[in-house]
Structures are given as C-alpha cells and as structure tokens.
C-alpha cells in the first residue's frame, strides 16, 4: 500500500491543499507530528474534524527512533497519511523517513503545501537572493551553539540574505521569539567579535506567516530588540545587499528607516 507525506501548511487547518485533504480523508490511518513547527492558528481537534479521522500525534522520539515500528508496518498493508507542518520535505527529518520507507519496500508520495520558504516572499526580499539557512538554538548546559553566526557571515560576504529558523521545544511549549534570537546573536558577537551582528545590523522579523495578520517589521537591532511582535512562530532574517525594490518594500511595508535606501543598496 502507500505512505503519503502530506503538508499541512503554515498557520491553520485551512492551509492544507485540496489534494492533501482528499487523500488524507481516504487513508486508513493518519499520523502527524508537530515538533518541527508551530501551527498557531489551529488545534488537533480542528484538523481531525476537517479530515474526519482520528489522528495519532507522534513525538520526536516516535518519529526519529520508532518510525519503522509504528508507521511503516501499517503502511505495508494500508494507505497511511503522515501529516507535517509546512511542506513535508523541508524538514530534513522527513526526507530521511522517506528513505526508510523506500528501504522497507513501502511506496510513498509527497503532497506539497505552503512553506516558510515561499512565505518569506511577503517580506519583499527576493527569494533567489537567499543563501544558506540556519537555526538559532537555545543553549543547554555547557552547549552554546554558534554555527548560525558563521552562516550569516558567509552569506553576507556574498551579498546574500540569511533566513534564521528559531528553536522550538514543543514538549516544553517553548517557541523562541525574534527578540530572544537577537539577544543570542549579540552574545555570540561578543564572543567572536566579527562585526557580523551588532546593534546597527539591519534585520527583518516575520511573525505568524500564513495568517491573515502576520507581523512584518524591518529595522536595526537596537530599535527592534525590545519590540513586541506578537505570538509565535517568529523567524528572523538578516538581509544581505539589497536591490532598490527590496529596500523600498522594507521601508513602505515593513517600516524600515528610509536611510536604508542609500546605505544598504
């Protein structure tokens, strides 16, 4: 039989595509995970009501360590849907799951949905000018990750924008805000002193992408770090060299200071 990786989109249950909904309704079993992203505009109950089926929510451990024992045996005999926030294979974990399904002899298909990679277009930044992405992770104990700082540096040297995903600890209901991410980046700057991320760095904040009322703000770190961007999820973007249209958009739509029209272009 078949395993379907079905994207749920970005914000609420209405973001799933018609194709995804039709296939999910026909499946014998429906699983989902919500630890890779937050769909702030919906609930499990609303998704179940839309699909008309009970959904078993899998934990990170279920997905990463027990997928072969929980999902794949059922997919060998039945049609199974695995629902994921955003677009299914944007999360590298899900790509690995499809490899496992292939090796287990389970046929699989991917049903796409809105993704943060397309939604960032609402910031006015040109998609083709984004470089490598990175995740700003919460420090834990003696572990203080800094690789995202290096990604910003590498992209900036090429004039490219950096999309920063912000850490999620779904089991603890912890969703990093853009403010927390900026604070962490300033700490890393103090450690590395590379001039990559300072109070005068231009940043763009996008909150609740996919909703009807997203927050889109652009400005210098010193001006935005204390601003309230509303409920998560948030992402943080560090722009590279701006095209004049990008700069004008950030000024007119995202509230960036007009001086970026001559400084950053």
Swiss-Prot record:
Keywords: Methyltransferase, S-adenosyl-L-methionine, Transferase. It is an enzyme of class 2 (transferase). GO terms for biological process: methylation; protein histidyl modification to diphthamide. The keyword Methyltransferase applies. Pathway: Protein modification; peptidyl-diphthamide biosynthesis. InterPro entries: 4pyrrol_Mease, 4pyrrol_Methylase_sf, 4pyrrole_Mease_sub1, 4pyrrole_Mease_sub2, Dphthn_synthase. CDD domains: DHP5_DphB (cd11647). One of its GO terms (molecular function) is diphthine synthase activity. Its EC number is 2.1.1.98. It catalyses: 2-[(3S)-amino-3-carboxypropyl]-L-histidyl-[translation elongation factor 2] + 3 S-adenosyl-L-methionine = diphthine-[translation elongation factor 2] + 3 S-adenosyl-L-homocysteine + 3 H(+). Coiled coil: none annotated. Pfam families: TP_methylase. S-adenosyl-L-methionine binds at residues 10, 87, 90, 115-116, 166, 209, 234. NCBIfam families: dph5. PANTHER family: DIPHTHINE METHYL ESTER SYNTHASE, DIPHTHINE SYNTHASE. The diphthine intermediate is not stable in vitro and readily eliminates the trimethylamino group. It is not known whether the elimination reaction also occurs physiologically. Belongs to the diphthine synthase family. S-adenosyl-L-methionine-dependent methyltransferase that catalyzes the trimethylation of the amino group of the modified target histidine residue in translation elongation factor 2 (EF-2), to form an intermediate called diphthine. The three successive methylation reactions represent the second step of diphthamide biosynthesis. Homodimer. This is Diphthine synthase. It comes from Pyrococcus horikoshii (strain ATCC 700860 / DSM 12428 / JCM 9974 / NBRC 100139 / OT-3). The lineage of its organism: Archaea, Methanobacteriati, Methanobacteriota, Thermococci, Thermococcales. The gene is dphB.
